[in-house]
């Protein structure tokens, strides 16, 4: 338990209907008793039952600062497992600062970013994966990201990681016991048994690792790149999807020379839409850089939208783009369907097996079909998303990859016929690495770094 008491404004520092000042620590009740007075002047918060709310006033010595409601949560039944008070006041910036200053003057110190959640972790109320999911809940950009983050906040990752760790620890204990007491505990045929157990854990860890791309998409959105030749209608399409003029649209080929990126929400699905330079052979140095970037973004995209000007004949640039997209998740748009067609669906289908939609960006024809196609691809898992109960972040992914290597080394050790004491070394390495994910064996510097990313008052 921490010995000092912290305080912070937990709501946004802008005028609003209500502001909240949060206090947590061993002196919380003494501080609130000094600055709070009930309407009749008789009630002391410290004497009240936990999880109750009280109307009254905050005083700075003999001066009324604000009319408030005070929510009391006594240890250990609070967010931090410490005595905690939340002061609900009027949401003016000045009044919130004034109350915070009064709290600090009476014995608290300003909280660091994320320190309330850090105390919840250090006091054992949540593990490190749950703490990280708090950030994801706050930053969720759609219903799917929120659902995933809330599942993780409930401890879904913790349950799976703990189960794997317990099974590994059981084998470590068995090996050590057998080595200490070989007369009573036999290791005959044990390598074959352990091989199956470790192989199963490799499978389990690998399954958790597979959720990483899902997590990135849910947190950050689907990286969607628009490619095509100059003047195919890429910028017009971006403007339609965004709902306003973001890209310059002209008849001059090569107007877009760099990547324009906008984020849109398509019925709860977040898309990071990038309009790229038109792909063609060019002697212009600046435009060539833009073309190279367009190809690179397309290679790394979750989804590519390839816009073809259907009113002009296909050329080498079109075939180059289609070759680039053979193994990518892509939608092909035959734009300018309001004009005489020189490129048909049948012609494209002979070159590449992708969803093809005829549209007119100018007349806004086919846009709804495009949006529905993107939604269908998302829900059917064609852009790596599926309805997993949780997703992992980069830190957790790294530890899982290291764990996987340790387990694979154990398998190799068994196959090489090494002595049994070598097995427990690799298993212990895997056990400790999994502990880093949930915070049971993690360095203080890493904990500090994780919680420094939180907002103030959380």
Give, region by region, the residue ranges found by the protein language model:
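Generic enzyme active-site microenvironment
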Residues: 273, 307, 333
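A glycine-rich (often HGG/GG-containing) alpha/beta subdomain
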Residues: 1-147, 151, 155, 331
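Glycine-rich, N-terminal phosphate-binding loop of Rossmann-like dinucleotide-binding domains
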Residues: 91, 241, 276, 308-311, ...
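Short glycine-/polar-rich loops that comprise or flank the Walker A/P-loop
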Residues: 16-18, 51-53, 300-304, 327-330, ...
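Conserved beta-strand segments of alpha/beta enzyme cores
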Residues: 109, 270-272, 355
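C-terminal-of-GTPase-core extension/linker across diverse P-loop GTPases
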Residues: 2-9, 13, 143-265, 282-284, ...
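Switch I (G2) and immediately adjacent beta-strands of P-loop GTPase domains
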Residues: 54-66, 70-74, 254-282, 300-303
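Inter-motif core of Ras-like GTPase G domains
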Residues: 287-311
């Amino acid at each position: 338990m921490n010995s000092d008491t912290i305080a912070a404004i937990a709501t946004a520092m802008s005028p609003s209907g209500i502001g909240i000042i949060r206090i947590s620590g061993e002196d919380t009740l003494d501080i609130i008793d000094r600055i709070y007075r009930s309407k009749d002047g008789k009630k002391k918060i410290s004497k009240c039952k936990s999880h109750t709310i009280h109307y009254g006033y905050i005083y700075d010595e003999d001066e009324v600062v604000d009319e408030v409601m005070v929510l009391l949560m006594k240890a250990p039944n609070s967010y931090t497992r410490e005595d905690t008070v939340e002061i609900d006041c009027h949401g003016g910036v000045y009044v919130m600062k004034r109350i915070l200053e009064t709290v600090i003057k009476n014995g608290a110190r300003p909280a660091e970013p994320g320190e309330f959640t850090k105390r919840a972790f250090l006091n054992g109320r949540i593990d490190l994966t749950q703490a990280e999911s708090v950030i994801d809940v706050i930053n969720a950009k759609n219903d799917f990201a929120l659902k995933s983050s809330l599942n993780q906040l409930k401890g879904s990752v913790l349950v799976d990681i703990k189960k794997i760790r317990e099974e590994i620890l059981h084998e470590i204990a068995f090996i050590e016991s057998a080595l200490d007491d070989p007369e009573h505990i036999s290791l005959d045929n044990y390598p074959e048994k352990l091989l199956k157990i470790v192989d199963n854990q490799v499978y389990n860890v690998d399954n958790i690792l597979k959720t990483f791309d899902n997590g990135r998409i849910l947190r950050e959105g689907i990286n969607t790149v628009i490619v095509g030749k100059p003047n195919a209608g890429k910028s017009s399409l971006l403007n339609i999807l965004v709902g306003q003029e973001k890209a310059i649209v002209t008849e001059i080929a090569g107007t877009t020379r760099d990547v324009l990126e906008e984020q849109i929400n398509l019925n709860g699905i977040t898309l990071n839409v990038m309009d790229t330079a038109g792909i063609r052979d060019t002697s212009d140095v600046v435009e060539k850089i833009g073309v190279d970037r367009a190809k690179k973004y397309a290679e790394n995209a979750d989804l590519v939208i390839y816009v073809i000007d259907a009113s002009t004949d296909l050329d080498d640039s079109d075939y180059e783009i289609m070759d680039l997209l053979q193994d990518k998740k892509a939608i092909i748009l035959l734009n300018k369907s309001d004009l005489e067609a020189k490129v048909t669906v049948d012609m494209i289908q002979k070159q590449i097996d992708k969803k093809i939609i005829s549209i007119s960006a100018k007349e806004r024809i086919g846009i709804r079909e495009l949006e529905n196609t993107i939604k269908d691809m998302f829900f059917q898992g064609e852009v790596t998303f599926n309805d997993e109960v949780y997703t992992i972040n980069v830190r957790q992914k790294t530890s899982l990859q290291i764990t996987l290597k340790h387990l694979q080394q154990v398998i190799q050790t068994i196959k090489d016929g090494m002595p049994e004491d070598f097995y427990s070394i690799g298993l212990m390495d895997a056990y400790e690495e999994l502990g880093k994910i949930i915070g049971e064996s993690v360095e203080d510097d890493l904990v500090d770094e994780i919680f420094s990313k939180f907002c103030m008052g959380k």
